[in-house]
UniProtKB/Swiss-Prot annotation:
The keyword Transferase applies. Its EC number is 2.1.1.159. Pfam families: Methyltransf_7 (PF03492). The lineage of its organism: Eukaryota, Viridiplantae, Streptophyta, Embryophyta, Tracheophyta. Keywords: Magnesium, Metal-binding, Methyltransferase, Transferase. Pathway: Alkaloid biosynthesis. It comes from Theobroma cacao (Cacao). GO terms for molecular function: metal ion binding; S-adenosylmethionine-dependent methyltransferase activity. InterPro entries: MeTrfase_7, MeTrfase_capping, SAM-dependent_MTases_sf. Binds 1 Mg(2+) ion per subunit. The keyword Kinase does not apply. This is Probable 7-methylxanthine methyltransferase 2.
Amino acid sequence: MAMKVKDIVFMNKGDGENSYVKSAGLTLKVIAKTQPIVQKAVQSLFTGTHSTPLQVVNVADLGCALGPQPLESMSIVIESIVEKCGELGCEMPEIQFHLNDLAGNDFNTLFKGLSVVQEKYKNVSWFAMGAPGSFHGRLFPRNSMHLVHSCYSVHWLSKAPKITSEAGLPLNKGKIYMSKTSPPAVREGYLSQFEEDFSSVLRFRSPELAPDGRMVLILNGRQSADPTEKDICYLWDLLAEALSYLVSEGLIDEEKLDSFNVPYYNPSQEEVERVIDKEGSFTTEFSDTVVLEIGGKNAWSDPGLRIKGYRCFSEPILSHQFGEEVMDKLFDKAEEILAEDYKQGKEATKNISIVVVLKKKTNQTWT
């Protein structure tokens, strides 16, 4: 069965036990940690070369998902603009949010949650609309967006890299992502696909951004030059081990496991900056890594909670490949393995984010 990423990469829907709404705690921590960076980028829109104050600020949230994540991002933007306009003594502009994700995203649950923002900012004139589509292509009219924001989305690839021998045999058998045992071709394939896809994200956003527009991108990344370092690959190695167990139990076909690779890449800061420089549409105003400790005694020290956090974003793509009927068994086994790893100190202990703030270059023209 051919895998069309645009049809299956989305977060778990609804508001049930395994939904993204109930399990997006890690992403919220990333948003909180990066809030000052986003706030500064938003407020820089009011200190540029605009001949007249902005009357409408258009904001795009790429890969917005659902639940508290997009609502918190919207709140940060609104509060940043309110604060800056208060400082400058200027009239508060209207704010238009363009909430983008693939068509499979649960936009209904997303829109239901907007009442929280509505109640919180009754005196602010803001609007929200859905913008379904892939950020690997064009989404918005030329020169229309003042701010493009994305948190934990653009590390998803447009497709999994093709990792086979000349004879068409899988080279990453028993794994679903890079690992210590993967041959060099696997690492090269993933990096090449990331470079192609991230370049397309930049290339398609450039004409859409207004002059002096900003783009804030937050990606799940890595600090190490080694893309198979434990904190990076632990999740996918854990799930591959659980899937291998299901193969041994006759619950899934080994060929399905051997032929599957997740369309996901954890870049280093250097890899991100290299693509930005080569693509050439933006200047980098800020670039850094943000580290969250997820080991030890914290909210993720419970194996069950941690597995729910993994399941809420990985289940849709895994169920498409291996079947919905084995998902409970898969994540139960993963929790069992994780609990044992906790005892031995083998689990991942850090979550790494790459944060960049980009400004559209002023010398570009679009015809």
